[in-house]
Swiss-Prot record:
Entry GO MF terms: ATP binding; CCA tRNA nucleotidyltransferase activity; tRNA binding; tRNA-uracil-4 sulfurtransferase activity
Signal sequence region: none
The protein's name: Probable tRNA sulfurtransferase
THUMP domain segment(s): 60-165
Reported function: Catalyzes the ATP-dependent transfer of a sulfur to tRNA to produce 4-thiouridine in position 8 of tRNAs, which functions as a near-UV photosensor. Also catalyzes the transfer of sulfur to the sulfur carrier protein ThiS, forming ThiS-thiocarboxylate. This is a step in the synthesis of thiazole, in the thiamine biosynthesis pathway. The sulfur is donated as persulfide by IscS.
Keyword rRNA processing appears in the UniProt entry: no
UniProt organism field: Geobacillus thermodenitrificans (strain NG80-2)
Keywords, ordered alphabetically: ATP-binding, Cytoplasm, Nucleotide-binding, RNA-binding, Thiamine biosynthesis, Transferase, tRNA-binding
Pfam families: ThiI, ThiI_fer, THUMP
Domain of life where this protein originates: Bacteria
HAMAP family listed in its UniProt record: ThiI
Length: 401
């Protein structure tokens, strides 16, 4: 007897009340997309949990993929048997025997959801625990801190046995909170912001500002590689690559050096907001962390934000750099982010940027420029590619067929 299914627990989704089924269906669809390489599996779901029937598929690679699906609190390999005491005993014993149990401790934790079952939970604990002890060697009982917790759940459709919980990615299923545009540079912070945004259920489309010849094709490829890492958590992601050279040069030539960074960020936000409207997004996500650099002081963010009424979400706002780096390493974006290819945010960085810019002065400087046609041109010439975890990338036209 082998594990024949994986039991999935929802966690935060259980608080969603009448809307829970919307979240559960989205999670099922996200899991099905993630596991499409395993055609024999079958996914069954109910209000409080989900089951993946393996039907002969190997569980190890499936477990690895489930760890990156948002909306899963935890999951366990499981066996199912009839609501019969003898069958439950043998199933629990088989589950323990598939583990390296010798020299370990265990306990049995039974839960009788089906109140028609003739044995109480404590009686099941005793009966099954005694059977396991009789049929194994070098395994002892520890009810307080066991190495192995044999969980038995008697439900109306059958009894489920698990022995080991694996923590999932948590959060909410991607797509349940709407769509947002992620302003993605080649640095450490913005990919982490994208990851955390998806963890809260957002579908993201990435926007990258590309300034050739000052930034190279290698810098562009670096961003594509970062997006591909994020697809492990969110599925296919659109990447919008904005030609930004003319806008950036106009600002650099027409705005005093200490204010150029603020005006550049304002232009980026205007373009991103226009792309958001075109793509029917509801918010913009950035990798800003309060006080980390000159453009991320509260005064700077206030002046930059003035160009839009769209919600600007900043998942990293209270994190320090070391916390951000730790997450970047966990999601495998760190080593790509530190590759030495400059992005548009670094090539025209002023020596002494204003950390407390005045909105009136920014507006005065920008009034001397005719940026609107350049912004419109950048929006119209934006290149869109679709990046997938498995398939790599395709341009938007190809991706439609």
């Amino acid at each position: 007897m082998k594990y024949d299914r994986i039991l999935i627990r929802y966690g935060e989704m259980t608080t969603k009340g009448k809307n829970r089924n919307i979240f559960v269906r989205r999670l099922k669809n996200n899991i099905a997309r993630k596991l499409q390489a395993f055609p024999r599996i079958k996914i069954e779901y109910m209000r409080d949990r989900m089951y993946i029937l393996l039907n002969g598929e190997p569980h190890e690679p499936i477990i690895d993929k489930l760890k990156t699906v948002f909306g899963i609190h935890s999951f366990s390999l499981a066996m199912k048997c009839e609501n019969d005491l003898a069958a439950i005993k043998e199933t629990a014993l088989a589950a323990v025997r598939q583990l390296p149990y010798k020299g370990k401790t265990f306990k049995v934790s039974a839960r009788r959801v089906d109140k028609q079952f003739p044995y109480r939970s404590d009686e099941l604990n005793h009966e099954v625990g005694a059977h396991i002890l009789r049929q194994t060697e070098d395994l002892t009982v520890n009810v307080r801190q066991p190495d192995i917790d044999v969980r038995i759940e008697v439900r109306q459709d059958g009894t489920y046995v698990t022995c080991h919980d694996i923590f999932g990615a948590g959060g909410l299923p991607v797509g349940t909170s709407g769509k947002a545009m992620l302003m993605l540079s080649g640095g450490i912070d913005s990919p982490v912001a994208g990851y955390l945004a998806m963890k809260r259920g957002l579908e993201i489309e990435a926007v990258h500002f590309f300034s050739p010849p000052f930034t190279s094709e290698r810098a562009k490829q670096k961003v594509i590689d970062l997006v591909r890492k994020l697809t492990a958590y969110g599925g296919k992601i659109k990447l919008h690559i904005v030609p930004f050279t003319e806008v950036q040069q106009a600002i650099y030539q027409g705005v005093p050096n200490e204010y150029s960074l603020i005006s550049t960020r304002r232009a980026m936000l205007k373009i991103t907001d226009a792309l958001r409207r075109r793509q029917r997004g509801l918010a913009i996500v950035t990798g800003e962390s309060l006080g980390q650099v000159a453009s991320q002081t509260l005064e700077s963010m206030y002046v930059i934000n003035e160009v839009t009424n769209t919600p600007v979400l900043r998942p990293l706002i209270s994190m320090d750099k070391m916390e951000i780096i730790e997450i970047a390493k966990q999601i495998d974006t760190h080593d790509i982010s530190i590759l030495p290819y400059e992005d548009c945010c670094t090539i025209f960085t002023p020596r002494a940027p204003k950390t407390k810019p005045k909105k009136e002065k920014v507006l005065q400087h920008e009034s001397q420029l005719d940026l609107a046609p350049l912004l419109e041109k950048a929006i119209n010439e934006t290149e869109t590619i679709v990046i997938d975890e498995e398939a790599g990338q395709a341009d938007e036209f190809t991706a439609l067929f």
